[in-house]
Amino acid sequence: MFRRFLAVFLTLGVILFAGWMTLRRDDIPYEQLEAIYANTDSRYLAFGDNMRVHFRDVGPRDAEAIILVHGFSASLHTWEPWVDNLKRDYRVISIDLPGHGLSRCIDNAQIGPAQFIETINRVANTLEIERFTLAGNSMGGAAAWNYALAFPQRLDGLVLVDAAGWPRTETESEDRPLVFRLLEVDLARRVMKDLDLSSLIRGGLEDSFGNPGFVTDEMVERYASLARAPCHREALLELVSGQGETRREATPELLSGITAPTLVMHGERDNLIPYQHGEQFAAAIPGAQLILYPGVGHLPQEEIAELSAGDLRAFLTTRVYGVREEALQAIAPE
């Protein structure tokens, strides 16, 4: 009996190991990824601890500047529709945050908002941009409102697109896509870290759009490949597990300190961050403008690119740069 049990146990072990080896995927060198996902607008900024940030800088150099930061596991590619819309009239800088896209990781440092804020500052300083409008989606939205509190003197405007930051209720946590719930389990993270997660990535992306048909094979391949850049899987797991840098949660008292003109955008069919969180941001930030998009998911900048970019343009014209120009004219000597 014992021998039979041992034989079954060993057979199952061999099958599981063979399956793990079949699904296991090695890192993809940055040089190989850059050949596919960089373009002629790509730039790189190196600083201490082996950090190398990938960003793109397009549009007139003397135009008002907009800096765009993406969400968890995404890359600057999420902003391409907005960049195409805005680059004629604005200087548009999109950034791959540390541990994402084509950016490296900072050695021996916890990944999180402080790193992201430092990265935004370093890129802006390198480009000699003193003031700008900062837009962030999801995790990038959390980085954006934290930046607005840390460096209010640098912001002309703030744009929060399905931004993260408010504490989740138990129901909201249970309703999130499967891939995010799995990644919160320590054993699942250890098993999944080196595996091909394309099917889970596809499911997560389909949950991110109001229309799941928006997800393409090319999009899934990009997310899966960039996650396999050296150090990226470790960084992503560190972020989702909460083992990275401590993140502060949004509160009405905290957000009341934001002084930049603010636009809050949120898809009403966002399965990752409920639209009620967008309403909370708009209620807490003084003078914030709220736009909700019925039927739209977590990524309005992609799903309804033309409409959301048009709303951004209107905000910049009426609430940010148009207002500033009127103020400058009012104080100009005759």
Language-model segments: which ranges?
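Conserved hydrolase catalytic core segment
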Residues: 130-172
